[in-house]
Every structure is written in C-alpha cells, then in structure tokens.
Amino acid sequence: MSKGIILLAAGGTGGHVFPAEALAYKLKERGYSVHLVTDSRAERYAGKFPADEIHVVPSATIGSKNPIKVARSLWTLWTGIRAARKLIRTIKPLCVVGFGGYPTVPPLLAATRMGVPAMIHEQNAVMGRANKALAARVQAIAGGFLPENGGTFPEKTVTTGNPVRPAVIEAAKQPYVPSVPDDPFNLVVFGGSQGAQYFSKAVPTAISLLEEPLRKRLRITQQVRPEDMETVNSCTRKLEMGADIAPFFSDMAERIGAAHLVLCRSGASTVSELAVIGRPAILVPYPYALDHDQAANAAALAATGGVKVIPQAELTPEKLSTILRGAMTMPDKLAKMAAAAKQAGKPDAASLLADMVEAIAAKRSIQDFKGAGV
C-alpha cells in the first residue's frame, strides 16, 4: 500500500526532468506513489520516468515586452494555476517538489496557496528565474551547488547535490580505463539534452586538422540537432572515422562511462553526472545564458581539477584540435582528471533529497531537518 502521493513538477528539458526522475525512483523505493506534472516538451525524456501518472498543465513564460503577448501569457498562467489547483484537490499530494522551468510555476503557486507542503530543487550554482520567483513561498530549498550559508534564504537551504538517474549510478561502477596508443579513443560530444549547433561546426573541423593516425583512432559519439545531422554525417564520412551521430541518445550515461574524454556544455545535470561517473571533460559553458549559470557550474567542478573550462569564444577548431591531440597522447593526465572528477561526485544526492522530501511531507520544519542532520 502506498504511503501517499508526492507530486513532482519539472520543466520539459532533460536538465529539469532527469534529477526529478532520480528522485522519483528513490521515492518509489520508499513506498510512495509519484506523479509528474510537466509540459509537452518532456515527452521525449519521460519514457523511463517512474511516474504513476503524468499530467500536463498550461503555463507560459513572461519574457516579452509586447503587452498583447504579456496578457496572453498571464491568461495562460492563470489557466494553469486553476488546472493545478484542481489536480491537487483530486490527487491530494503529501508534498509538491519543483525542479525549475516555467511549467513548475502553476503547481507550486497552487500548492503554496492551498497550504500543501512545497519545496524546490535548484540544480545550478545560480538560481533560475522560476525557482527565484517561488523561493520565498516554499518551505525548503534543495540545491545542487547552492551554498547553505549564502544566498537569500540560507535558513531553509540544504546542499543536497543533484540527484542522478539509476543509469548514471550504473555507469559509475565502470572504472576509468586510460587510452592505449594505437587503440580506439572514445570521444563523447553533446550540448545538453537539446544539442549544440556550435559543436556540430567546430568538432568536424578540429578533427580534420589531426594527423591521420590520430584521426583513425577516434571513435566519436556526437549529439547534434536534427537539422545538423546530414552535415555532420557527411563530414565524418569524408574523414573516414568511426562515428555515431544522433539528435538524442537514450543510453548517454553508458556512453559517458565508456568515454576517454567528454566535450560538452555545463548544465547542472551534465556536470553532476560527469562527476558521479568520473570522466575527464572539456566544458564549454553556453555563452548566452541570462544568469551565466553554466559558467558557475563549470567553475565548481573545475576547482577540483576534474575538468577544463574553455569559453566558446576562445575554443577555435585549431585550439580544439590541439587539445584533442594532447588528450590522445597523454592518457595519464586524463586518468588524473577522471579521479579528481569522481572524488567531487555526490552519488547519494537522491537519497538525501528524498529524506528532505519526507521531512517536508511530514510537516517537519526545515530547521528541524537541518539540525537533526536527517
């Protein structure tokens, strides 16, 4: 028999859905029913989500200065809050947990107005706009990188780390095996769950600058946008190299586990998964983020020595080619980076976050939770 329902709310990108998925597995293990409320974008990421039910409520972001668009967004938001109130009255959750993204705003606002215990989890080192708007209203804030002794609400913030999915925990069991001269070198390239156009242009050019013996060693897994598939595939065929190119890989954790080097953006989930699995990486923060959250995430892991951070403006194909050449000829250096990254990982983040959810659902104060250390 279920202990009750926990309602998780997450925006429809992998960065929001994946940590919610990790928590959902942990809560199910502890006997709770889990419902997910999200938007239509999450469909591609929610295939393995262990939710008893998935709900979609209307929501919108208010980013335009056009008064007509603002009015439409406000109406959609109001409609979403009404739908969320109806959902909460129907399923009667013990607690509502938000993971960021504008689709979390209606259910979290509805919960706080209805007196239902609510909390948020912020994956990044800098709080996102949706979570920032909700932070004052909820009982507790869990953070992937947020410090407990800083920020606006230190008294109700707990640094749990970012929960990672079971597939990541499984991949972490595989030790890092340094590359061997003349053997295949596995390079994994991705730009977060939505891909990165920049890598689609820079990586093939950089590889073309490598000497033929090095180029023939490369085995590349690269996530690209659908519109870039043909171009990237054409480049890899011309270079006569082993490549697996796709818009999305459902087994990305396993592929990272098999990598000698990872080249990627530095979203919170990505950084956390790299650390738990323990793989060396070149992080290229997304340069147009409003709050520069990816740069802050990257800096947190770079401080351990597990990754190198290079701004996109500085990473020319020539520089990337030089980096790849060095990585393929200095396996000991990558092995040290892998060990440093793994030491920074928090594989128990999902358990700590589940402890926190249970405390809030039981209407314990977050101060009591922090004081008890349980």
Curated annotation (Swiss-Prot):
GO terms for molecular function: UDP-N-acetyl-D-glucosamine:N-acetylmuramoyl-L-alanyl-D-glutamyl-meso-2,6-diaminopimelyl-D-alanyl-D-alanine-diphosphoundecaprenol 4-beta-N-acetylglucosaminlytransferase activity; undecaprenyldiphospho-muramoylpentapeptide beta-N-acetylglucosaminyltransferase activity. Its EC number is 2.4.1.227. The keyword Ion transport does not apply. One of its GO terms (biological process) is lipid glycosylation. Keywords: Cell cycle, Cell division, Cell inner membrane, Cell membrane, Cell shape, Cell wall biogenesis/degradation, Glycosyltransferase, Membrane, Peptidoglycan synthesis, Transferase. Cell wall formation. Catalyzes the transfer of a GlcNAc subunit on undecaprenyl-pyrophosphoryl-MurNAc-pentapeptide (lipid intermediate I) to form undecaprenyl-pyrophosphoryl-MurNAc-(pentapeptide)GlcNAc (lipid intermediate II). HAMAP family: MurG (MF_00033). This is UDP-N-acetylglucosamine--N-acetylmuramyl-(pentapeptide) pyrophosphoryl-undecaprenol N-acetylglucosamine transferase. It comes from Rhizobium rhizogenes (strain K84 / ATCC BAA-868). The gene is murG.
